[in-house]
Design a protein with these regions (language model features):
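Conserved N-terminal segment of class I S-adenosyl-L-methionine
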Residues: 1-194, 204-207, 271-273, 280-285, ...
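Short, glycine-/aromatic-enriched active-site segment of Class I SAM-dependent methyltransferases
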Residues: 225-249, 254-259
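Short N-terminal helix/helix-N-cap motif within the alpha/beta-hydrolase-1
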Residues: 201-205, 232
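A short glycine-rich, Lys/Arg-flanked "PGG" loop and its adjoining helix->strand segment in the class I
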Residues: 204-219
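A short His-aromatic
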Residues: 195-199
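Short conserved AdoMet
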Residues: 142, 201, 215
Length: 298
């Protein structure tokens, strides 16, 4: 693996603060710190972007992590896989897809019928989310929606282009910051950050880019590992939300709200089900204010 890493201060404070090293959590050489001022937990020395394109690309680390968990706890791993299958295939529950569809419909209802609704999935992988969502949409909504993706992995970006092209969309092979910066100001309606913000070494600048690219009233849907979950307290270093070195930020509802508001976004939804302590996932719907507000600390 490449030796290139970066060194970060607290991503929420964006400056040097007093921190505490969390011992016996990440394997060497990775260092995890908690900011004593904000409570934010982060990887101090994440790998650089170049290694994330290939050797530490999501599909590589996900497969490796899955294999390690299957070997370490085969029964628990098998049960987890079974429950995921039941939720998605039998109960047909996919919270991110369902929320994205609802937000797209809201965005369309608030705009003239002859105007397109632009959706962006940041860290879109193979394009499965928006590609599948376009097929689920009612015809009238599908005709108005334009799906876009941003993906750093070379191979996944190629797959995403193929998935989105039939729906008039495209994937930008770029970092999240560069990809979002290419969108015109106030041009997007819905941005999806599903299982992504925990990977981004500059999460607050990314949210600021999202704010700039959104039309007033536009939405950001966030899903991240829930660092306040009871399972994390129970499992400790074996918690499923810990993945080294590609998970670099660990959010609670408090720190996610603080970061969103610092970026100039409002938290429209983060209800009890979205931050349920028995769930390993934390959800939030952020919204760009209809009237400009001064971003806190921007």
């Amino acid at each position: 693996m490449s030796d290139a890493t970066t060194t970060r201060v607290c991503p929420l404070a964006e400056r040097a603060t007093a921190t505490q090293v969390i011992e016996d959590l990440a394997p060497s050489p990775w260092v995890v710190r908690r900011c004593l001022e904000t409570g934010f937990v982060f990887l101090e020395n994440p790998p650089g972007y170049d290694s994330l394109k290939e050797e530490l690309a999501w599909q590589v680390t996900y497969q490796r992590e899955s294999q390690q968990r299957a070997r370490a706890e085969p029964l628990r791993y098998a049960l987890s896989r079974c429950l995921k299958y039941l939720r998605r295939s039998v109960a047909r529950r996919h919270k991110v897809a369902d929320l994205t569809l609802a937000l797209a419909a809201r965005a369309a209802a608030g705009r003239p019928h002859d105007q397109a609704v632009h959706l962006v999935d940041v860290g879109c992988g193979s394009g499965e989310l928006l590609g599948g969502l376009m097929q689920r949409m009612p015809a009238a909504l599908r005709q108005r929606c334009k799906p876009h993706g941003v993906e750093l992995s070379t191979e996944l970006a190629r797959q995403s282009v193929l998935a989105l092209a039939p729906h008039g969309g495209h994937c930008r092979h770029a970092t999240a910051l560069d990809g979002m910066a290419r969108f015109a100001p106030a041009s997007l309606d819905v941005i999806v950050l599903s299982s992504f913000l925990e990977h981004e070494t500059a999460p607050l600048p990314l949210l600021r880019h999202c704010d700039a690219a959104l039309r007033p009233g536009g939405f950001v849907l966030v899903k991240v590992p829930n660092h306040a979950s009871w399972n994390r307290w129970l499992r400790g270093a074996r918690w499923c939300g810990y993945r080294w070195p590609d998970h670099v930020n660990y959010f609670t509802s408090t720190t996610l709200r603080a970061m969103a508001e610092k970026a100039g976004l409002e938290v429209e939804r983060m209800n009890g089900r979205d931050r349920f302590p028995l769930s390993d996932s934390l959800y939030a719907v952020l919204r760009k204010p209809l009237r400009p507000v001064a971003a806190n600390g921007a």
